[in-house]
A protein has these predicted regions:
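A well-ordered secondary-structure block
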Residues: 195-305
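Long, non-membrane, amphipathic alpha-helices that form coiled-coils
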Residues: 1-55, 329-354
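Surface-exposed intrinsically disordered loops and tails
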Residues: 70-78, 109-132, 217-244, 302-331
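Extended hydrophobic/Leu-rich segments
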Residues: 47-50, 55-58, 62-69, 77, ...
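Low-complexity, Gly/Ser/Thr/Pro-rich intrinsically disordered linker/tail segments
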Residues: 289-353
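Short, well-ordered surface patches within globular domains
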Residues: 56-207, 261, 267-288
Length: 354
């Protein structure tokens, strides 16, 4: 009787174990399918976003007015350029429009929920960014996005472009942004030549800087800002700051005699390649700046060269960082081929999970 009872208990235990094992396998299969579905969905969204990125297209009358102002920077030409830019941009497909807001009992403040123009496509990346410690990869991605936008604008105006992103530019702008943050000065203090000198590298030096306040990130000074509370944001939010800055350098630059537009778009047909780096700085006092720094070789200089045929001397710009191939362009993340390979692999996993 005891033996029979033990046999029955063993059979019950075996059945229970089989059931538990089957349940566990089913749960694991369900989780694997959910992961595979999520991976495919995310990659599809990212690829679509890159292929459909919103890149401002300047109409011919803006280009003509810009070149006219470069040729003759009279007040009349400056006003004419600004008027044409405002007419082009306001309520255009490149204008985010009006903030859609609502009151948040949780934050006891008004929060921005969306924007009236929902058709602008920016890069999608929900990964977290520590505003006090942007990684090299995050800085590289911001730099590449800016290079993509500004090179497109240069192509529209001049028919060629000159921005590249290099490892040195990424490190240089990272150190410069850190120096700005440590200075902890108000935005009104303007460009800091002390911070700009702290690139920390022997090979390069800053040649020009555009800068913009983190308006959207910091709630335009009137709305709730999660960045102020947590000092953390999503990468997509920093892409928005880059886009807003590019637009601002065109549409909100009359007060600076279009100096920001000149640095970004150029004042003549580009002939020399230039490395550019983009990083955000965030001070202890919650002042956020996006920095766009153009770099030259540390020892760049002009030399007087004799023309052997005429005997005349003329100046020649020499920059070993670019001329000798030290500056090596980093591959852009806005090429979807790698993502498409990842999507193929993700779809294979999805099929297996099904």
């Amino acid at each position: 009787l005891t033996t029979k009872k033990n046999q029955e208990e063993a059979k019950v235990n075996e059945t229970s174990n089989e059931l538990a094992s089957a349940t566990s396998a089913a749960q694991e299969a369900k989780e694997n399918k959910e992961k595979a579905d999520k991976a495919v969905e995310t990659l599809n969204k990212q690829i679509s976003a890159i292929k459909n990125l919103t890149i401002p297209q300047l109409p011919q009358n803006v280009i003509d007015a810009y070149k006219a102002y470069l040729a003759d920077d009279s007040d009349a030409n400056k006003t004419a350029l600004n008027d044409i830019i405002q007419k082009w941009f306001k309520n255009s497909k490149y204008d985010f429009g009006t903030a859609i807001t609502e009151y948040s009992p949780e934050h006891q403040n008004i929060v921005i929920k969306d924007w009236s123009n929902k058709d602008i496509v920016l890069p999608i990346d929900d990964s977290e960014v520590d505003l006090d410690n942007l990684t090299d990869k995050q800085i590289e991605a911001l730099s590449q996005y800016y290079a993509l936008l500004s090179n497109n604008l240069q192509e529209q105006v001049w028919g060629s472009h000159h921005y590249i992103v290099t490892e040195e530019a990424v490190q240089g702008v990272k150190n410069i942004a850190k120096a700005y943050a440590e200075e902890n000065k108000p935005y009104s203090s303007g460009h800091s030549y002390t911070a700009l000198a702290k690139d920390g590298l022997d090979s390069i030096a800053w040649a020009g800087e555009n800068m913009n306040f983190n308006n959207t990130l910091l709630g335009y000074g009137a709305y709730y800002s999660e960045a102020k509370e947590t000092r953390k944001v999503r990468m997509s939010q920093l892409y928005r700051e880059v886009y807003d800055s590019v637009i601002s350098f065109i549409t909100n630059d009359v007060h600076a005699n279009f100096g920001h537009m000149k640095l970004m778009v150029g004042e003549k047909v580009p002939t020399n390649v230039r490395a550019v780096g983009v990083a955000n700085s965030f001070t202890a006092s919650n002042v956020g700046r996006m920095h766009f720094v153009e770099f030259k070789g540390r020892n760049a200089h002009f030399e007087y060269v004799k023309d052997e045929q005429t005997g005349d001397y003329h100046s020649k710009y020499v920059d070993d960082y670019y001329d000798t191939g030290i500056a090596k362009p980093l591959a852009t993340p806005f090429d979807t081929s790698k993502m498409e390979d990842e999507l193929t692999a993700a779809k294979a996993k999805q099929t297996t999970a099904n």
